[in-house]
């Protein structure tokens, strides 16, 4: 199963486990809430998917790698206490609360979320002294004498034995108490995630051409050679920072993330080509509608790999524009909500004597506290977090401008803030207009170069895969996207019908 399907299975499990009956009791009792066990190769996104599931379900997440724990930290430290049995006092051994269970309660207190996921990574790599405690944890949902709180799903992840010499295989008794999900690497699924995370365009273009380099694990006389999804994502992050700082990116840097010499060298060579294509084809000029006939002819005559790379450059730049428009929309929507709330406070009969600055400051502090709480709970994805930070920054600016302008009355202050908000709304409209123009220009360039050929099919398919382009087009429209997408769907449907007819003919020939 790919990681996207595994994510859906985990979400469904959470929804089912947290469902309650008319008496407020969990419909599935804790003893029947099987832990979810993800088994798969290292670096394919098992930990990242838990963060996404927790965020999308609005629950807390406590994550631990069991290889960092000893028996004492997992089940608690022993201490001596006195107890009376049958009228006689005895000295007995008890245990402090497990560090892991204590972290669950700390998270509940910090975030206010009473339900969540307790995720234990590398669970089948626990030390020999800790292995019995792990089996007890999976079977009984306890660490030592302390149970995992109700409303918390237990999830764990491990690697198959071929990837880790420290692996201890679970017995049938343990496996019969978990929901085991085997996860396989899948580039097409990871690509959807990559677009949303803003993975470097060169990586996406390269992997589109070299899909077999997305994940590699080889054993040689010199040791392991490997490339993982985690490695590509971390490489993307460092590439962007290096480019922003104008630092050289060499093969040695790439090999630090892609620990497979042949693939690292191949990508380093491709990265040089990718940058050359960006300069040769003047991608920004294309998206501004300033492309030349020579650029069109050059692309028409180019090898297929080069065509894919240029389309990757266009898609990467478009994705940045769509992402910027999405973030601007989130920011303005948040500001609009804040202004409505501010207006209500200004007009409230209970706040007539309160200076406008105090009301504004109180609102700002409340929104900052709410943001800090959501951020602490991990409920915000990166773009939403940036939008919230921008919203708070603009609210601080609005307050400072009101004070600087010497506003005394609430009406005067609100009029000034409303005018400042209008400029932010105009900025959002400009971002949307710019992104729409870039999309139209990209279509115009590709139409002139390839018409409705396979390159256009690939372009439409990639737009449909990208979270930000789908969001942008669904809200702002694109005539050419709708037209080509409809033609593509029609062609696919027609192809399926023809295949079904041929299949039916074959079956009839076999019968007669």
Task: List the model feature ranges, each with a label.
Residues 98, 149, 171, 200, ...:
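Alpha-helix initiation/capping motif
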């Amino acid at each position: 199963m790919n990681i996207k399907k595994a994510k859906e299975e985990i979400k469904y499990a959470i929804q089912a486990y947290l469902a309650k009956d008319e008496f407020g009791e969990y419909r599935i009792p804790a003893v029947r809430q099987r832990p979810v066990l993800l088994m798969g190769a290292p670096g394919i996104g098992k930990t990242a998917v838990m963060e996404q599931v927790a965020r999308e379900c609005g629950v807390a997440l406590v994550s631990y790698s069991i290889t960092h724990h000893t028996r004492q930290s997992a089940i608690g430290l022993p201490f001596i206490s006195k107890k009376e049995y049958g009228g006689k006092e005895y000295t007995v051994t008890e245990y402090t609360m497990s560090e892991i269970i204590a972290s669950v309660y700390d998270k509940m207190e910090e975030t206010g979320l009473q339900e969540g996921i307790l995720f234990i990574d590398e669970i089948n790599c626990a030390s020999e002294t800790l292995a019995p405690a792990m089996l007890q944890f999976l079977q009984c949902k306890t660490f030592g004498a302390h149970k995992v709180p109700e409303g918390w799903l237990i999830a764990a992840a491990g690697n198959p034995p071929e990837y880790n010499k420290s692996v201890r295989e679970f017995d049938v008794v343990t496996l019969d108490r978990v929901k085991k999900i085997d996860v396989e690497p899948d580039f097409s699924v990871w690509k959807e995630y990559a677009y949303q995370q803003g993975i470097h365009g060169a990586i996406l273009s390269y992997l589109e051409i070299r899909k077999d380099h997305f994940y590699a694990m080889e054993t040689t006389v010199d040791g392991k050679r490997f490339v993982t999804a985690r490695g590509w994502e971390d490489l993307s992050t460092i590439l962007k920072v290096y480019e922003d700082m104008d630092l050289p990116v060499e093969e040695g840097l790439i090999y630090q993330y892609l620990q497979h010499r042949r693939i690292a060298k191949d990508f380093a060579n491709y990265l040089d080509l990718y940058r050359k294509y960006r300069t040769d084809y003047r991608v920004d000029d294309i998206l501004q509608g300033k492309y030349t006939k020579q650029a069109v002819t050059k692309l028409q005559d180019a090898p297929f790999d080069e065509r894919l790379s240029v389309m990757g450059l266009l898609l990467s730049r478009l994705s940045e524009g769509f992402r910027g428009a999405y973030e601007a929309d989130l920011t303005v929507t948040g500001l609009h909500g804040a202004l409505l709330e501010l207006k209500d406070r200004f007009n409230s009969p209970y706040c007539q004597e309160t200076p406008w600055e105090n009301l504004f400051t109180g609102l700002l502090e409340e929104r900052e506290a709410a943001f800090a709480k959501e951020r602490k709970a991990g409920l915000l994805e990166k773009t939403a977090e940036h939008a919230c930070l921008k919203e708070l920054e603009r609210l601080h600016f609005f307050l400072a401008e009101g004070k600087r302008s010497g506003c005394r009355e609430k009406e005067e202050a609100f009029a000034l803030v409303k005018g400042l908000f209008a400029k932010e709304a105009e900025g959002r409209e400009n971002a949307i207009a710019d992104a729409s123009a870039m999309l139209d220009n990209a279509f115009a360039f590709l139409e002139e170069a390839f018409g409705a050929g396979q390159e256009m099919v690939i372009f439409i398919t990639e737009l449909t895969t990208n979270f930000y382009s789908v969001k942008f087009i669904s809200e702002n429209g694109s005539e050419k996207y709708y037209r080509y997408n409809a033609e593509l769907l029609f062609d696919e449907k027609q192809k399926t019908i023809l295949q079904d007819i041929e299949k039916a003919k074959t079956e009839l020939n076999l019968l007669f």
